Regions:
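A cytosolic small-molecule/anion-sensing beta-strand core signal
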Residues: 3-5, 131-132
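Conserved positions in beta-strands of structured domains
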Residues: 1-3, 41-44, 97, 121
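Active-site loop architecture of trypsin-fold serine endopeptidases
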Residues: 13-26, 61-63, 81-95, 100-126, ...
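Conserved active-site neighborhood of the chymotrypsin/trypsin-like protease fold
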Residues: 4-89, 162
Length: 170
């Protein structure tokens, strides 16, 4: 999710780290217009909240518009964007189906997330969850993956994420 014109990008911790929790040696970023930015810098990453900020060498990116996740209600329409299964710019739609759900990451730390029924799959992580005005209201992060469950995805609310993101940048 492009945060600023000067190259700050929001994503998930688990997107920029390996199994040992260390940042990948090389992170390349491809934007919607096909431009590839090589060797992005990990500015900060927080395992407990599954958030990370990276920076690419750019001066004129088009940042996303950010909304207010605290105003979301059950049943609100949302859109999830990502690279599900390696398929670039996959877009799925759904509704907000839960608020402030505790999602436990590998650390055992609970992250308060929005529950959505839009398809969230491997490759969607770090992508935006948009409201009906096209504003980012969440960061796609996880899903329940079990044979008996379908359509239970989770997104970190942008209001809570912004506090962590600002700390990671400073």
């Amino acid at each position: 999710i492009i945060m600023s014109a000067d190259g700050y990008i929001i994503t998930n911790w688990h997107v920029v780290t390996n199994e040992d929790g260390r940042a990948f040696d090389r992170i390349d970023v491809k934007t919607y217009d096909g431009t590839v930015y090589e060797n992005a810098e990990v500015v900060g990453a927080d395992q407990d909240t599954d958030l990370a900020v990276i920076k690419v060498g750019a001066a004129k990116l088009s940042p996303a518009q950010f909304g207010d996740s605290s105003g979301l209600k059950l049943g609100d329409k949302i859109v999830a964007i990502g690279n599900a299964g390696g398929l670039s710019w996959t877009t799925t739609e759904g509704i907000v189906s839960g608020l402030a759900r505790d999602v436990y990451e590998d650390t055992g730390y609970a992250i308060k997330c929005l529950q959505v029924d839009a398809a969230i799959n491997p490759g969607n992580s770090g992508g935006p969850l948009l409201n009906s005005q096209g504003q980012v209201v969440g960061i796609n992060s996880a899903k329940i993956s079990a044979p008996a469950y379908e359509g239970i995805g989770f997104s970190i609310p942008i209001k809570e994420a912004k506090v962590i993101i600002d700390d990671l940048i400073e």
